[in-house]
Swiss-Prot record:
UniProt xrefs under InterPro entries: Ald_DH/histidinol_DH (IPR016161), Ald_DH_C (IPR016163), Ald_DH_CS_GLU (IPR029510), Ald_DH_N (IPR016162), Aldehyde_DH_dom (IPR015590)
Function: Aldehyde dehydrogenase; part of the gene cluster that mediates the biosynthesis of the tropolone class of fungal maleic anhydrides. The pathway begins with the synthesis of 3-methylorcinaldehyde by the non-reducing polyketide synthase (PKS) tropA. 3-methylorcinaldehyde is the substrate for the FAD-dependent monooxygenase tropB to yield a dearomatized hydroxycyclohexadione. The 2-oxoglutarate-dependent dioxygenase tropC then performs the oxidative ring expansion to provide the first tropolone metabolite stipitaldehyde.
Classification via Pfam families: Aldedh
Catalysis performed (reactions): an aldehyde + NAD(+) + H2O = a carboxylate + NADH + 2 H(+)
Taxonomic lineage from the root: Eukaryota, Fungi, Dikarya, Ascomycota, Pezizomycotina
Protein name: Aldehyde dehydrogenase tropH
Family to which the UniProt record says this protein belongs: Belongs to the aldehyde dehydrogenase family.
UniProt-annotated catalytic positions: 260, 295
Protein's organism: Talaromyces stipitatus (strain ATCC 10500 / CBS 375.48 / QM 6759 / NRRL 1006)
């Protein structure tokens, strides 16, 4: 059954301020920034812009809350998180509507995001009992010493979420942090903060004050969070450029980071692939629904010479028929806009460079698609675009575009294929299409990526680690490793008595030191 979407006026957040310490707070300087509807380019309103002083106050509140939150029992923490999950499911339609209104993503495709965020909250609530240490054997009899470890929360964690699925990332990525006994400050994307503010309204009375905080803002807010001494870890879903800035700042303070960054992901098709399934997957893997704005998009498609022409022609047909750009809040829209005018200009510049470098434009290439219906005037739309005859040296084959542009490359030699696939600085995902298990296993071992699909694209599975290598990131999400990443391990040694005579013996054996 189709969701019952409320009028947009009823779904939008009432508050446009900062949310911390369990209250809505006016920025110290009352600084505001405009936020837009990308489908139309029109201003929705002005949102609070957190300053360094605001960040200081929010971090102090989060740290104060941490001192109590870390002492909550497993059952208490699970109760808070499961209540939050239930609220997200209850308000899925309105969250999707706000999200689409402020991101340009089609509302019909965004409803599932509330379920994904709620599932993550339930999942990590269930993993809280795994926050246990180990009893470890030492080099000498156990009657002399007891060795064990404990896992402890880190403190205040800052999580920066991306503009393609803001409230989903906010809800899902806070889960591991608070499950681990930490408090969290979420920085929404500056282009699209509204769904995160609505999320704060929904959770305002769920968690104790200061446990979950949401600070909209720009570069000053991000810099202040990264460099604040009481913020123990910083996590980003975003661009490589932003990730490197955060890592430099955090590294100077010996602060831990977790990064899910960009991708230039390869879809590799062998001659024996199921052609019908391959065609559908190539079209789906580019994530044209949200205008290609996904770090996991399979934007480089490597088609074997023997199937290249047939697959390319059929993919073009599917894309032309399957993606109808339009107003994001219209449930019949199947392709959204880009997030901003700057993003639209960037994508169009990549399209221009591809033409200049000799790639063959097969479909798209402009700001809207007459075959699929003209989007709303003023929106930041770009047609679903496919280039063929792409060579590895072209910009569109090497750099992440983060837009609806697919590069199709022809291949025949497997060793050369692998060299080209691995020639970028990215390593997030890869897809391999073949019916032969030996071929799949051979390619899995050779493709440089943190996550590889075989005969599939773009799917995430809770409890299966997701993340990249090389410039695509550090750390793994959506699994128990994500939970552990927001804890510290403390090692404990207890002298059980009567073991003082061991000191000289152990020192002589080189098995202890006094450093």
């Amino acid at each position: 059954m189709a969701p019952n979407f409320p009028p947009i006026e009823e779904a939008l957040p009432l508050h446009h301020d900062l949310f911390y310490d369990g209250k809505w707070q006016t920025p110290i300087t009352d600084s505001r920034r405009e936020t837009l509807n990308p489908s139309t380019g029109q201003v929705i309103g002005k949102i609070a812009d957190a300053s360094t002083t605001d960040v200081d106050k929010a971090v102090e509140a989060a740290h104060k809350a941490f001192l109590s939150w870390k002492k909550t029992t497993m059952a208490e923490r699970q109760g808070y998180m499961r209540r939050a999950a239930a609220i997200l499911r209850e308000h899925a339609a309105e969250l999707a509507l706000v999200e689409s209104y402020n991101t340009g993503n089609p509302v019909a495709a965004m409803v599932i995001d509330a379920e994904r965020a709620a599932n993550a909250l339930d999942y990590f609530a269930g993993l809280i009992p795994m926050l246990r240490g180990e009893v470890l054997p030492g080099p000498f009899p156990t009657e002399d010493y007891l060795h064990y470890t404990v896992r402890e929360p880190m403190g205040v964690v800052a999580r920066f979420v991306a503009s393609n699925h803001p409230f989903m990332f906010a809800g899902a990525r806070m889960a591991s942090v608070i499950a681990g006994g930490n408090t969290v400050i979420i920085k929404p994307p500056e282009q699209a903060p509204l769904s995160c503010l609505r999320l704060a309204e929904l959770l305002e009375n769920v968690f104790p004050p200061g446990v979950v905080n949401i600070l909209p803002g720009g570069a000053e807010c991000g810099q202040a969070l990264t460099c604040h001494p009481l913020v123990r870890k910083v996590s980003l879903i975003g661009s490589v450029a932003t990730g490197k800035i955060i890592m430099r700042n955090a590294g100077s303070l010996m602060k831990q980071t977790s990064m899910e960054l960009g991708g230039k992901n390869a879809l590799i098709a062998f001659p024996d692939a199921d052609i019908d399934h391959l065609v559908r997957s190539v079209a789906a893997g580019m994530n044209f629904t949200w205008a290609g704005q996904s770090c996991g998009s399979t934007s480089r498609v490597f088609l074997h010479d023997s199937i290249h022409d047939e697959v390319l022609a059929r993919v073009v047909e599917v894309v032309r028929k399957g993606f109808r750009p339009g107003l994001a809040t219209d449930p019949t829209t199947t392709m959204g806009s880009l997030i901003s005018k700057a993003a639209q200009d960037r994508v169009l510049n990549y399209i221009a460079s591809a033409r200049e470098e000799g790639a063959r434009l097969v479909t798209g290439g402009g700001m809207f698609d007459d075959l699929a219906g003209t989007p709303v005037e003023g929106g930041f739309f770009v047609q679903p675009t496919i280039f063929a005859d792409v060579t590895p040296d072209m910009k569109i084959a090497r750099e992440e575009i983060f837009g609806p542009v697919m590069s199709v490359l022809r291949w025949s030699d497997e060793s050369e294929l692998i060299r080209i696939v691995n020639s970028t600085n990215y390593g997030l995902t890869g897809s391999i299409f073949t019916k032969d298990l030996a071929t799949a296993q051979r390619m899995i071992r050779q493709v440089e990526a943190g996550f590889v699909w075989v005969n599939d694209v773009c799917k995430h599975f809770l409890n299966v680690p997701y993340g990249g290598i090389k410039d695509s990131g550090i750390g793994r999400d959506e699994c128990i490793d994500e939970l552990f990443a927001y804890t510290n391990i403390k090692s404990v040694n207890i002298n059980l008595g009567g073991a003082t005579h061991l000191g000289s013996r152990l020192s002589q054996a080189g098995q202890i030191s006094n450093t």
